[in-house]
Amino acid sequence: VLDIRAIAEIAHRHGALAAVDNTFMTPAFQQPLELGADIVMHSMTKYLNGHSDVVMGALMFDDQPLTRLANGQGSSLYERLKFLQNAIGAVPGPMDCFLVLRGLKTLDVRMMRHEANARWIAEFLESHPKIERVLYPGLISHPQHDLALSQTSGHGGMLTFTIKGGLPETTRFLEAVKIFTLAESLGGVESLIEHPAIMTHASIPLAEREKLGIGDNLVRMSVGIEDCDDLVADIEASLAEI
């Protein structure tokens, strides 16, 4: 968890824009523009759409002149980004826009359920003897818990944890899950689970991964909106296979 207010202040002091990826939190839980950010990015593929059937992104911002930037460019932020969008061709299709607008209708209720389930699972994992560590901003044990409380109204549905053991134990756990789907994406109504060491970060050497805290026993969950008792039962049964 990063201090958005502090980052924005440092960026502005040096004549730079502050951009925040708000995909995990969504506008339901965090509004970076109100915290000093200039640009907010969303992978709308994820929570804003919420149904795993769109590939789309968006930038949100309050328009402003860019004369204060170190490069001295005088056009507005909107004009600059609109030019880049036109030049690059990053324009979504009508059907993609329709699907995201459909998802936005249920964003608030979905995010509340994502968070409730994630918190429940995080607390369960934190007390399990086969789990080494749980990282979820909603837990008091999270090192940036107080910071998260100061800039968000919720903590979302993403969490990571480390299993006691290494690659063999983690692999057995992942092979045993029934409700969770083994996949790299996130933010849909269905629960996903992934193993960064052999999936999203497989190309990074072990020594570099471990410096980043991404060991062979790290697991990431995108907690969906299913019945939480079913999700916990799936996790508990899978941990019993280790």
PLM region descriptions:
Residues 1-130, 135:
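Conserved PLP-enzyme active-site core in the AAT-like
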Residues 4, 110, 175, 191-242:
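PLP-dependent enzyme catalytic core of the Aspartate aminotransferase-like
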Residues 99-109, 156-164, 220-224:
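Short, well-ordered beta-strand elements within core beta-sheets of diverse protein domains
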